[in-house]
Curated annotation (Swiss-Prot):
Protein name listed in UniProt: Translation initiation factor IF-2
Similarity remark: Belongs to the TRAFAC class translation factor GTPase superfamily. Classic translation factor GTPase family. IF-2 subfamily.
GO cellular component: cytosol
Compositional bias of kind Low complexity: 93-109
Gene: infB
Binding-site residues, GTP: 226-233, 272-276, 326-329
G4: region residues: 326-329
Protein source organism: Bacillus velezensis (strain DSM 23117 / BGSC 10A6 / LMG 26770 / FZB42)
Location of this chain's protein in the cell: Cytoplasm
An annotated Gene Ontology molecular function: GTP binding
G5: region residues: 362-364
Biased composition (Polar residues): 57-83
């Protein structure tokens, strides 16, 4: 009997690879994965086991069903607090009545006044019953001093005194933050718990938790990534056995297309992401909704810059990667070189002892396509992809556009639940009712289950690609949530929240907003990029680590800025500059770019920013010009320049440059500034003055003295 791989044996006896792996584990036979080779002896043992009855292998599964069952979160409202003010109000009413009677009594006026005052002085309100300290108090966001006192059963004045001892001056209606609430509660030995209340605009508030028994196997969502012209769309075309490329402008995919195929009764959904550099964000979005990434690399071209970008996106999304080595039918093809190059990025073939599946194929001739589809189904089986089809649909927008005839059109990928025609829906910051649905073949459908891509119409506006969508029970709620989300987005745009920058990095770290610092490193040569990356990854301050999301060689491009914007990263340029498009995009997206020529300066700047010790930035501002019209040499003083202020003004504490024939001769400071015989602080345009320069005497007639000051740039 010949040797067989795990998945081949599983296929031969008509069971899943996972059952075989479990059986081998129970037999104390170590195998890495479904691609491992089985010896003849092992195959015989498996034959014997499954002939006796393999039910024992799978019998453990049902017992685990309830283990991971999500427990519903019973968020009961806090019990109504006893109305403590009622007694007090009643007493006030009694006192008011008493005072009225007192005013009406005119006999013995002064005596009665004195008696009543004495009575009121000693007449005390009934004491409030003391409330026992609770074991735990819950709050959301913040509490006022009065509300916290109510929760603890204490007088507000008592809490105000405690706050004063802690250096906090607070009134009864002042809001207290989380730390102060916890500190005061700990003084009384009471635990605190912050309850996160979801806003009306958050779709998570309207979601229902799925039960384990409701989950069913769903088709995998596969993203095809790779460099330009490496054959991504041709590969997808070959898999679908239809012509997609011919309809694309210039043979390059212009929009994300979502397609579905069926193989042996099992469906697979494909996302075709554009490979052109300008569509970096579209490729990043494709990786966020995917279950498996197919990395297409041309066997005759090898690893290219966008191949590396695709690897980084797939790793960031934490999805398994299958490498499709395309164009193996070409004479110049060298699959081994591709495998060797990809090992540098952590993709080691199984044939070399790694865990990455490599499939050699030709998208043009169709060679290796069946094996690739089989590998996709195999990986999805191991991943155990599940969703609940019997609930309101939820998913992601793949693409959206405004069509002249149909209005707002959005391509949606249903990730869980079933989408129906007529469903009220909120998509990102838009809302509407699903008027019509069309599948990837252009046919009208009425329903779409998990992992199904459909094109819908009926929204009030065009959503953004990458937005989440959720179906609601009624149109009124959907409209309310959609309008609230649109209003919130408008407010956020007005506030113009800035991206992460080194200037405000320390504040964000202190507030807990930043746990990892994402960096994109671009250098002039690969060696510099590697050295800088290695040095940066060693930095760790207060538990905050540096994370390099992309490295590259060459100028900083628009693609780098878009990636930085999407991942909230800072761009580090080493001996390189940003091109024109990159500069304008960085300004529009508020992306921080730092340019350096010395490695240790980069390290120092990042560390200083993380520690909150970043030096302030200054910019030079020219404030005036003085034309030297005459010079005087005085012993013990040096050369005095008699000048005329031609522009702006000059001050005694300004810096200056001595310019002769357009060339800067000297840069220094003003020593003495006089007008006639008087020392002055400033001389304005149109006036004459006398100037001496610190430690410099070579001043000639016709020289220009340029005065400037260094102004600190306001941190953004």
């Amino acid at each position: 009997m010949a040797k067989m791989r795990v998945y081949e044996y599983a296929k031969a006896i008509n069971v899943s690879s996972k059952e075989i792996l479990t059986a081998l584990k129970n037999m104390d036979i170590v195998v890495n994965n479904h691609m491992a080779m089985l010896e003849e002896k092992t195959i015989k043992q498996l034959d014997a086991k499954f002939k006796k009855g393999g039910a024992g292998v799978t019998s453990q599964k049902p017992a685990e069903t309830n283990k991971n069952k999500p427990q519903g979160i019973n968020q009961q409202p806090a019990g109504n607090q006893p109305n403590k003010i009622r007694d007090g109000k009643k007493n006030d009413v009694q006192n008011n009545q008493f005072n009225k009677n007192k005013k009406n009594n005119n006999n013995n006026k002064n005596k009665n006044k004195r008696n009543h005052n004495n009575k009121n002085q000693y007449q005390q309100k009934p004491l409030k019953p003391k409330k026992e300290l609770p074991e735990k108090i819950t709050f959301s966001g913040s509490l006022t001093v009065g509300a916290l006192a109510e929760e603890l059963g204490k007088e507000p004045s008592e809490l105000i005194k405690k706050l004063m001892l802690l250096g906090v001056m607070a009134t009864i209606n002042q809001e207290l933050d989380k730390d102060t609430i916890e500190l005061i509660a700990s003084e009384y030995g009471v635990e605190t718990e912050e309850v996160i209340v979801l806003e009306e605009t958050e779709l998570e508030k309207y979601e229902e938790a799925d039960k384990e028994e409701d989950l069913q196997i769903r088709p995998p969502v596969v993203t095809i990534m790779g460099h330009v012209d490496h054959g991504k769309t041709t590969l997808l075309d070959s898999i679908r056995k239809t012509k997609v490329v011919e309809g694309e402008a210039g043979g390059i995919t212009q929009h994300i297309g979502a397609y579905q195929i069926e193989e042996n009764g099992k469906k697979i959904t494909f996302l075709d992401t554009p490979g052109h550099a300008a569509f970096t964000t579209m490729r990043a979005r494709g990786a966020e909704v995917t279950d498996i990434t197919i990395l297409v690399v041309a066997a005759d071209d090898g690893v290219m810059p966008q191949t590396v970008e695709a690897i980084n996106h797939a790793k960031a999304a934490e999805v398994p990667i299958i490498v499709a080595v395309n164009k193996v039918d070409k004479e110049s093809a060298n699959p081994d070189r591709v495998m060797q190059e990809l090992t540098e990025y952590g993709l080691v073939p199984e044939a070399w002892g790694g865990e990455t599946i490599f499939v050699p194929l030709s998208a043009l001739t169709g060679k290796g396509i069946d094996e690739l589809v089989e590998m996709i189904l195999l990986v999805s089986e191991v991943e155990e992809l599940k969703a609940n089809p019997n609930r309101q649909a939820k998913g992601t927008v793949i693409e959206a556009e405004l069509d002249k005839g149909r209005g707002s059109v959005a391509t949606l990928l249903v990730q869980t639940g079933t989408l129906n025609v007529g469903d009220p829906i909120v998509v990102g910051n838009t809302f509407g009712r699903v008027r019509a649905m069309v599948n990837d073949l252009g046919r009208r459908v009425k329903t779409a289950g998990p992992s199904t891509p459909v094109e819908i119409t009926g929204l009030n506006d065009v959503p953004q690609a990458g937005d989440q969508f959720l179906v609601f029970k009624d149109e009124k709620t959907a409209r309310s949530v959609g309008e609230a989300r649109a209003s919130k987005q408008l407010e956020e745009q007005r506030s113009d929240k800035a991206k992460l920058s080194l200037d405000d990095l320390f504040e964000q770290i202190k507030q807990g907003d930043v746990k990892d610092i994402n960096l994109i490193v671009k250098a002039d040569v690969q060696g510099s990029a590697e050295a800088l990356t290695a040095a940066l990854q060693k930095i760790e301050v207060e538990g905050v680590k540096v994370k390099i999301i992309h490295t590259g060689v060459g100028a900083i491009t628009e693609s780098d800025i878009i990636l930085a914007s999407a991942s909230n990263a800072i761009v580090i340029g080493f001996n390189v500059r940003p091109d024109g498009n990159a500069k304008s995009t960085a300004e529009a997206e508020n992306v921080d770019i730092r340019l350096h020529r010395i490695i240790y300066k980069v390290i120092e700047e990042i560390e200083a920013a993380m520690k909150g010790m970043l030096d302030p930035e200054y910019e030079e501002k020219v404030i005036g010009q003085v034309e030297v019209r005459q010079t005087f040499k005085v012993s013990k003083i040096g050369t005095i320049a008699g000048g005329y202020v031609t522009d702006g003004h000059i001050t005694r504490d300004s810096g200056l440059r001595l310019i002769r024939d357009g060339v800067v001769i000297f840069e220094g400071e003003v020593d003495v500034l006089k007008r006639f015989k008087d020392d002055v602080k400033e001389v304005s345009q149109g006036y004459e003055c006398g100037i001496t320069i610190k430690k410099y005497n070579d001043i000639r007639e016709g020289d220009i003295i340029e005065a400037y000051v260094m102004q600190e740039i306001e941190r953004k």
